[in-house]
């Protein structure tokens, strides 16, 4: 048995809340004697802070921040531009000869990820190709997020993008782990703002 545990997320921007997901990946890896991998979306689109397609940070920039913010997992982050979706990540792991796959996701996404991964497991895709064929697949919940809670439990990318837009420096920096210096936190806020369509009053 050769097992892998992975997560896939937007991380726009990375926050203290994402530690919950990464920690869950690490725990699952220990539980199942598996290797841990963390993938990030490459999506980048300059829109308003609350747009669902808002992805202000470029991929390479985001991966650099992730490694600095979560140095304990720096070796687990995968930087590979051939991996665009969570299905590509599964294929990437299958090509590494893993036979058992575990994915960690938010509680609200467990069902949809389970359905999609099983839909393609050992089954041809639209082009007739089998992109992966694991002996077993399981999607594990990283827990729920309470948007009204303080700290990591209630942190979200939307809150962080709004704080960056409104130049709410204290609020923005409170959502970033202290593995970044104050100057680095301010630089991240600047980079997020640069990737947003800002209202005239916030420019």
Predicted regions and their residues:
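Nucleotidyltransferase catalytic core that binds NTPs
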Residues: 1-203
């Amino acid at each position: 048995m050769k097992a892998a545990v992975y997560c896939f997320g937007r991380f726009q921007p990375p926050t203290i809340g994402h530690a919950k997901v990464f920690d869950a990946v690490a725990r699952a890896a220990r539980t199942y004697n598996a290797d841990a991998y963390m993938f990030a979306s490459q999506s980048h689109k300059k829109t308003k802070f609350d747009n669902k397609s808002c992805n202000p940070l470029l991929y390479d920039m985001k991966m650099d921040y992730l490694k600095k913010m979560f140095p304990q997992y720096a070796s687990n982050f995968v930087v590979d531009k051939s991996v665009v979706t969570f299905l590509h990540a599964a294929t990437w792991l299958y090509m590494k000869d893993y036979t058992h796959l575990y994915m960690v996701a938010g509680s609200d996404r467990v069902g949809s990820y389970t359905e999609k991964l099983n839909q393609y497991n050992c089954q041809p895709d639209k082009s007739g190709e089998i992109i992966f064929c694991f002996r077993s697949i399981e999607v594990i919940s990283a827990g729920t997020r309470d948007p009204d809670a303080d700290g990591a439990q209630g942190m979200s990318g939307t809150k962080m993008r709004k704080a960056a837009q409104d130049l709410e420096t204290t609020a923005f920096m409170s959502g970033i782990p202290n593995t970044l210096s104050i100057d680095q936190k301010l630089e991240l806020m600047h980079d997020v703002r640069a990737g947003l369509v800002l209202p005239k009053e916030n420019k």
